[in-house]
């Protein structure tokens, strides 16, 4: 892996790794947890399910569904009893023809800001592999709630499996770096009063990018104050947590 790319080979995968693959020309990334033997547990949205956005994101995020239809199952995955929610797939079906990337944990502030695209790393530290795999397998059996693009998506699922951390406030966009980046980008352009301090395009771009970086940083699960550690059994017993 390099500073600007987290791309890895399948041979480098280890159980407990948080992986992702870009969809729709790098518009959106799908995330999951590697559990070994070439399998991935991930949280996905099935066909015909609403996620509450009412926007083009409904069509984009449908790309997180498995690559094989139910009437033509993958020979490695087998005849899966469900194609939405928390599911188990082989790595190839998870990638859906895309490249494989490793999500990084415990990065420095400098590296976090260099990786300007959200949804690739976090300042938060990862738990040991045995804890990660326990959460992922428990949620495979019990579910992770209703998929929502901004508040409960595949990246939220993977980050929870890796850290056990949940957002305790109801006004948040969740743990997802992708969702936080979208909100940060919009806020940087529309909401910042600093944009009135410059009239040049380059000045506006610099101010907007600075606000974007600050918004991303304060939204990261590794620095937020509204984060609590929740055992997976408690999460399943109280899904409205």
Placement of each model-derived feature along the sequence:
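Cysteine-nucleophile amide-bond enzymes
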Residues: 1-241
């Amino acid at each position: 892996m390099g500073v600007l790319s987290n791309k890895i080979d399948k041979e480098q995968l280890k159980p407990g790794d948080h992986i992702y693959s870009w969809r729709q020309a790098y518009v959106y990334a799908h995330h999951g947890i590697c559990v070994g033997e070439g399998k991935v547990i991930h949280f996905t949205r099935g066909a015909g399910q609403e996620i509450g956005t009412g926007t083009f994101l409904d069509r984009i995020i449908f790309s997180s569904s498995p690559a094989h239809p139910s009437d033509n199952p993958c020979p490695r995955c087998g005849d899966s009893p469900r194609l939405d929610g928390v599911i188990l797939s082989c790595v190839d079906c998870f990638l859906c023809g895309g490249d494989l990337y490793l999500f990084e944990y415990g990065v420095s502030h400098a590296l976090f800001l260099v990786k300007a695209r959200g949804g690739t790393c976090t300042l938060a530290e990862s738990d040991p592999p045995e804890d990660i795999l326990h959460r992922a397998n428990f949620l495979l059996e019990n579910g992770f709630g209703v998929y929502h693009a901004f508040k409960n998506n595949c990246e939220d699922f993977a980050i929870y499996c890796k850290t056990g951390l949940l957002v305790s406030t109801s006004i948040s966009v969740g743990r997802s770096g992708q969702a936080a980046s979208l909100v940060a980008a919009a806020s940087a352009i529309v909401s910042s009063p600093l944009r009135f301090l410059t009239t040049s395009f380059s000045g506006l771009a610099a101010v907007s990018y600075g606000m974007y970086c600050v918004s991303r940083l304060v939204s990261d699960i590794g620095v937020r104050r509204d984060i609590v550690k929740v055992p997976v059994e408690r999460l399943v017993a109280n899904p409205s947590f």
